[in-house]
């Protein structure tokens, strides 16, 4: 009896884990929209879709004016959503052992400074702060954003290397490609690679801001495409995580 029970238990342990039932779509939408990042990424998609439409070709003057007004309004709305967001970067640095690694300081510190400065950019664009402060604030913000992405990409490339090593180790241990552990690692690897693509796209836009759109970085189609790609990847990640 004990042997049979053990065999049954062993057989049960080899069965693939049961997948949770699919979530109700509207409940999922509610959870997504209750997140600050969820709404922000929908606004980002809207903004860069409008920019891409403007860059794609000549539009009737009335339609072009409406799209430009919409794009500008959405951009200002997104900055309002960043109020206090720098606190998450402060907490991320606090979670690291002291002193934090240089690359973590670059990633979280750069992004934190960017979000902190963006609050003042928003106040200047909204008219509360003097308009003459805006160019300097935007330049400092763009540099902080770019440095943050350099650190973030570096960290994620290191994590990709570790995940690839873990997959190879599992396969050497006899795990098959279709096993749950390998499939889970493959999914994490894919998501991490997508995150790097997103950061590269955002870094290209930040570099365009830093260089005042000189050369290829002055292409409105390239910048709009990079922004839309980043927004879609981020929206996908947020949707899957909520």
Curated annotation (Swiss-Prot):
Q: Where are the transmembrane segments?
A: 103-123, 215-235
**Expression sites by tissue:** Expressed in seedlings, roots, leaf sheaths, spikelets and endosperm.
Q: What compartments host this protein?
A: Peroxisome membrane
Cytoplasmic topology ranges: 1-102, 236-242
A Pfam family cross-referenced in the UniProt record is PEX11
Q: Copy out the induction comment.
A: By abscisic acid and H(2)O(2). Down-regulated by salt stress.
Keyword Transmembrane helix assigned to the entry: answer is yes
What is the protein's membrane topology class? Multi-pass membrane protein
Look up keyword Signal and say if it applies: no
Q: Where is this region: Disordered?
A: 1-22
Keywords, in A-Z order: Membrane, Peroxisome, Peroxisome biogenesis, Transmembrane, Transmembrane helix
Q: What GO MF annotations does this protein's record show?
A: identical protein binding
Give the protein's function: Involved in peroxisomal proliferation.
Which family does the entry's similarity section mention?
Answer: Belongs to the peroxin-11 family.
Name of this protein: Peroxisomal membrane protein 11-3
Tell me the name of the encoding gene: PEX11-3
């Amino acid at each position: 009896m004990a042997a049979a029970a053990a065999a049954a238990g062993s057989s049960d342990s080899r069965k693939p884990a049961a997948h949770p039932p699919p979530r109700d779509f509207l409940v999922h939408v509610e959870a997504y929209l209750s997140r600050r990042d969820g709404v922000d990424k929908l606004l980002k998609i809207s903004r860069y879709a409008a920019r891409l439409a403007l860059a794609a070709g000549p539009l009737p003057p009335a339609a072009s004016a409406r799209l430009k007004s919409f794009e500008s309004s959405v951009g200002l709305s997104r900055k309002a959503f960043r109020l206090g967001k720098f606190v998450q970067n402060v907490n991320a640095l606090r979670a690291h052992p002291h002193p934090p690694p240089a690359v973590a300081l670059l990633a979280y510190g750069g992004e934190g400074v960017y979000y902190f400065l963006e609050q003042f950019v928003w106040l200047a664009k909204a008219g509360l702060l003097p308009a003459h402060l805006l160019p300097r604030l935007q330049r400092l913000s763009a540099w902080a954003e770019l440095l943050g992405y350099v650190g973030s990409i570096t960290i994620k490339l290191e994590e990709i290397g570790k995940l690839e090593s873990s997959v190879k180790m599992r396969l050497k241990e006899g795990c098959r490609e279709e096993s749950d552990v390998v499939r889970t690692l493959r999914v994490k690897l894919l998501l991490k690679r997508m995150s790097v693509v997103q950061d590269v796209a955002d870094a290209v836009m930040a570099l365009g801001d830093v260089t005042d759109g000189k050369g290829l970085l002055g292409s409105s189609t390239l910048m709009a495409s990079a922004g839309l790609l980043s927004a879609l990847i981020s929206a996908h990640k947020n949707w899957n995580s909520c």
